[in-house]
A protein has these predicted regions:
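Flavin-dependent oxidoreductase catalytic core characteristic
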Residues: 1-226
């Protein structure tokens, strides 16, 4: 019985990692659905895919897809290293735990926003059940809710940083792909945040967590193995 909480954590570790992968896959499918429509939809004499604003948005979504993939892939890789661990957990496990929270939070939000955007690209047709794109938004919304809501990922990630020093492990992990100044600045920012009064620390945690996830994704993209 005393091992029950750890067995639950193992299930969540796997399911949150799977959620990261599912979010990337759904986002990629939504981008494809948007592309498939935009390349044939003519407005002002040319496909809307070639219109400057939408073209720029496609480029942004493809960049976000790469960032989401980087987070998901790193989460999978770390889980593969630590999934058989039992307490007391190693530093590598605590690094995985923070990565899983960052990945689940960021990739799920990516899936929701990308599916919503794909519906907008398809215009009125995007809202109709007869067309596939509206389904991706309905399915994307659950990805940010089950296996721990965004609030849960943020607060659990904060706890991993505060009690296990997981942010230090993460910054060390990212150091080979980062500028030393960036790493130092992030270390100071997180340290300052963890020193805030409890209510303020929680209230302001989302911007820190979101920025850290984005920074992590961008640094991982500099890893030549991705």
């Amino acid at each position: 019985p005393e091992m029950g909480i750890y067995q639950i954590m193992e299930v969540l570790n796997v399911s949150r990692t799977a959620n990261c992968v599912a979010s990337v896959a759904l986002g990629q499918r939504a981008i494809f659905e948007a592309y498939d429509f935009a390349k044939d939809r003519i407005a002002f004499g040319k496909p809307i895919l070639e219109q400057p604003l939408l073209k720029a948005q496609f480029e942004e979504k493809l960049t976000s897809l790469k960032q989401a993939f980087a987070l998901a892939w790193e989460t999978v890789t770390l889980l593969d290293e630590v999934w058989l661990e039992t307490p007391p957990y190693s530093d590598r496990y605590h690094l995985f735990r923070l990565m899983a929270h960052l990945g689940k939070y960021w990739t799920a939000e990516f899936a929701v926003q990308t599916a919503k955007w794909a519906m907008e690209v398809n215009a009125g047709l995007g809202t109709l059940k007869e067309f596939p794109v509206e389904r991706w938004l309905r399915e994307a919304m659950i990805l940010s809710i089950w296996e721990g809501t965004p609030h849960r990922q943020i607060l659990d990630g904060l706890e991993a940083m505060e009690q296990k020093g997981a942010h230090q492990l993460l910054l060390t992990h990212l150091a080979p792909y980062s500028d030393a100044t960036e790493i130092d600045q992030w270390g100071q920012r997180i340290s300052d945040h963890l020193g805030l009064p409890q209510d303020e620390k929680e209230a302001k945690a989302e911007s820190l967590f979101s920025d850290l996830a984005t920074f992590t994704a961008n640094r991982l993209l500099h890893n030549k193995s991705l």
